[in-house]
Amino acid sequence: MEKRTGSLPKNAKTLEGVIQMGLTHVTVALKGLGGSNGTYEGDFLVDTGATDCLAPAAKLREIGVQPVGTMVYELADGTKHEYPFGLVEIRFMGEITAGRVIFGPDDVEPLLGITALESVGITIDPASRTLKRLPAIPLKMIATF
């Protein structure tokens, strides 16, 4: 398994009892890539401070998702913890993408991270706490010399 470093959201109740502050939720369906055993659907907390998605490990295993690596995540209190992650198909708001999901404790609140949101052109409006579609997904032009 590959080991990497990253950060967990600083404003969500996720791992190790961090306090929840965000209130935007969305229905998300996760499916393992390549021959999984079904779909896990849940009410996910949208957290723009989280890079990756997070779901209960037991639910991920039920649908055939297997860990493919581990990553060290820094929690809001500054402590670092290592967690396994797998790769999944992510469906929400009529969109589909694929990405990394952290195998969290079985009682954890699922999180939808910023990578999944940005990859389908959805952003969060902090004032209304709603998700909004961008008119277009930005691409940066690469300069050639």
Predicted regions located by residue number:
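Pepsin/retropepsin-fold aspartyl endopeptidases
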Residues: 2-145
